[in-house]
A protein has these predicted regions:
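Short acidic-hydrophobic catalytic motif
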Residues: 2-345
Length: 345
């Protein structure tokens, strides 16, 4: 999610000129599994919301445990696991550092929507291979973005849901004791919840707009939770404020934004003619971001996570401190619904 994101084409519409709509964006596409190599699950192509560069993501089955990102350029390859200890940035996005054989590093940014979908669909063995679809102005690049698509997680859900895995014993993190991290009025709280679920609750204000949203993922009977996710959380788009556009453009951000991939706030309303896609879309998108960020723990966190006006930086700092304070303990979710600590195995 791009907190306080404002994009280029949306603002031109606010000034009375036209913008590019989805019907004109033939670059965003999905390749079916049937016409692809056996290991290729899907492909998505689209623009990076900050860089404005077109990127292809090829999602493949992998023998490696977990989710991995990779990128190749000039005969050099870079990769990283999708884990919080590979974090490289949390400014208006979540980014990880990919390393190669050389000392050079490449950052993979805007991973949170993809990660949220992969997490909810319980994927454990996939690799997301990113490739630029145009020649960069410089010989080497230091950042590549996961495409923003329509600004939500819907297209990622469609692409990833067929790859869902069924495990006889699912590794999890158990919230073993209450923990709270605050930065001023912004707070995150982890609470013990003796059930096979992860509960999310968010409340916050966006200018003059106050919103709340919640979501519960039941890891034992996930289909119902996934259906709820598709209705309440996945459609929520990244958003930002109209008045922030000049500052962001001056920083080289939001170059790929449009009304097709972002919900733009202006006062107590929205620039987008259709307004919100779902009720409390802003708060729902904050939960989407939180799911993607906390998925970097590598395993589901069983417990309740309450967020007040939190964003990427607070999410990842709270996760780090939760581990450092031994608030998250390894465990397993068994098919009969029992949740046991790793020490009990």
């Amino acid at each position: 999610m791009l907190t306080e994101f404002s994009q280029t084409k949306a603002f031109s519409m606010a000034q009375g000129s036209g913008i590019q709509h989805n019907s004109e964006r033939s670059s965003a596409s999905e390749k079916s599994v049937a016409s692809s190599p056996k290991h290729l699950l899907a492909q998505k192509k689209g623009v990076g919301i900050h860089t404005g560069k077109n990127v292809l993501v090829s999602i493949e089955k992998s023998s490696q445990e977990g989710i991995h990102f990779s990128f190749s350029e000039n005969n050099s390859s870079f990769q990283c696991p999708a884990l919080w200890d590979r974090l490289s940035g949390t400014t208006r996005t979540t980014a990880l550092v990919m390393r190669g054989e050389s000392r050079k590093k490449v950052q993979v940014a805007m991973i949170e929507h993809f990660m949220a979908a992969a997490h909810i669909w319980k994927l454990h063995h996939i690799e997301a291979k990113l490739s630029l679809q145009e020649t960069p102005a410089q010989s080497d690049i230091d950042t590549i973005e996961v495409p923003i698509l329509d600004g939500s997680a819907l297209e990622w859900c469609q692409a990833l849901s067929p790859a869902q895995e069924v495990l006889s014993k699912q590794a999890v993190w158990l919230v073993s004791k209450e923990f709270e991290y605050a930065d001023g009025d912004r707070k995150i709280r982890f609470e013990v919840k003796p059930s096979p679920t992860t509960e999310y609750f968010f409340e916050g204000t966006f200018g003059v707009l106050a919103q709340k949203a919640s979501f519960c993922m039941n890891w034992l009977s996930s289909q119902k939770s996934q259906e709820e996710f598709l209705k309440k959380i996945a459609p929520a788009r990244t958003f930002g404020f109209l008045h922030e556009v000049e500052a962001l453009r001056a920083r080289g951000l939001a170059l790929g934004g449009s009304l097709d991939n972002a919900l733009i706030i202006d006062g107590n309303g929205f620039v987008n003619p259709e307004g919100e896609r779902i009720e409390n879309e802003l708060a729902s998108h904050k939960i989407l971001d939180a799911i993607g960020d906390f998925s970097l723990a590598g395993k589901p966190i069983l417990g309740k996570i309450s967020l007040k006006s939190a964003g990427h930086a607070l999410h990842l700092r709270a996760l780090q401190l939760a581990f450092e304070n031994n608030c998250l303990q390894p465990g397993y979710l068994l098919p009969d619904g029992r949740v046991i600590a790793q020490s009990e195995v």
